[in-house]
């Protein structure tokens, strides 16, 4: 959402060097981003998020994730889980990849 609105990126707003962000509530961070986007004259039409991870599986919590994210973002957010079927570092549980695209509309 930040990038689509021309407001920089998440690392600028919430740097990983900022101790105040360690353990922060991610939904509250999303609400803050949504407010910035709104203040800049944009509204979220929709966002599509793909999470690549073998475990835990996304399916059992997909609806709850979508509801929580949509509420915090102020627009429709969909979540899709993808698995690597045990291939590579992700398959060994050494990481997770999240990719999202957001469509914004002018208010």
Task: Tell where the protein language model's regions lie, with residue ranges.
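C-terminal binding/interaction regions
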Residues: 46, 57-63, 67, 71-107
């Amino acid at each position: 959402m930040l990038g689509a609105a021309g407001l920089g990126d998440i690392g600028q707003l919430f740097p990983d060097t900022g101790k105040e962000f360690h353990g922060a509530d991610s939904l509250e961070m999303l609400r803050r981003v949504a407010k910035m986007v709104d203040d800049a004259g944009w509204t979220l039409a929709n966002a599509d998020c793909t999470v690549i991870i073998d475990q835990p599986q996304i399916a059992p919590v997909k609806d709850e994730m979508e509801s929580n994210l949509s509420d915090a973002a102020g627009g429709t957010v969909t979540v899709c889980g993808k698995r690597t079927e045990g291939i590579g570092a992700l398959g060994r549980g050494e990481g997770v990849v999240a990719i999202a695209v957001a469509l914004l509309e002018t208010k």
